[in-house]
């Protein structure tokens, strides 16, 4: 099946890949939310500062890597940069499943923030690259809808998973 882009067509597989990047862009930080209230029980020696760092440092690291990925993608192979970002995001999400200390969880979450920062610019950037005119506007709307729908569904899923085991919400990063 071919999808019109305004400058030609793309396959359905390419469109689904673009949409999947939009889905991932909403996930950073999501797994921490359902376990935030329990972190003092999970890690009794954790300080309030460490808990605050766990929620803020990954988001802070997203900012420079969004800028860096955007800058690097000009005149370079965007898909390679995206693949590196997705790999970092996925592998750090898996590593969170095995975290045994607050410091380890903070470090892994920071690495996850780096990967997310490399992925986020492509959630709309790929749409802009592949589509023009009304086709672009429509796809940007779909991208935004997918991003928000993923956020809602993943929030519900991570909440349920947190009731089973505090590690399980991190599975959301392996999508």
List each language-model region with its residue ranges.
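Cytoplasmic helix-loop-helix junction between adjacent transmembrane helices
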Residues: 102, 108-147
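Small-residue-rich segments within alpha-helical transmembrane domains of MFS-like 12-TM solute carriers
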Residues: 26, 30, 97, 113-121, ...
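Residue-level signature of mid-helix packing/kink "hotspots" within the transmembrane helices
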Residues: 30, 58-67, 151-152
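Extracytoplasmic
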Residues: 13-48, 69
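Residue-level signature of the transmembrane alpha-helical cores
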Residues: 21, 82-88, 92, 108, ...
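Helix-loop-helix hairpin linking two adjacent transmembrane segments in secondary transporters
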Residues: 142-175
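Conserved MFS/SLC helix-loop-helix module at the cytosolic interface between two early adjacent transmembrane helices
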Residues: 64-103
């Amino acid at each position: 099946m071919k999808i019109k882009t305004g400058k030609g067509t793309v396959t359905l597989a390419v469109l689904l890949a673009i949409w999947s990047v939009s889905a991932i862009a909403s996930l950073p930080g999501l797994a921490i939310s359902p376990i935030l209230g329990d972190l003092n029980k999970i890690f009794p020696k954790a300080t309030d500062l460490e808990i605050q760092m766990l929620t803020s440092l990954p988001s802070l690291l997203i900012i420079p890597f969004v800028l860096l990925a955007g800058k690097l993608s000009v005149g370079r192979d965007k898909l390679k940069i995206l693949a590196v970002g997705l790999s970092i995001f996925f592998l750090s999400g898996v590593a969170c499943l095995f975290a045994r200390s607050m410091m380890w969880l903070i470090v892994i979450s920071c690495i996850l923030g780096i990967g997310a920062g490399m992925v986020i610019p492509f959630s709309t950037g790929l749409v802009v690259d592949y589509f023009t005119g009304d086709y672009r506007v429509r796809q940007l709307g779909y991208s935004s809808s997918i991003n928000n729908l993923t956020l809602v569904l993943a929030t519900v899923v991570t909440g349920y998973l947190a009731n089973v085991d505090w590690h399980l919400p991190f599975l959301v990063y392996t999508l």
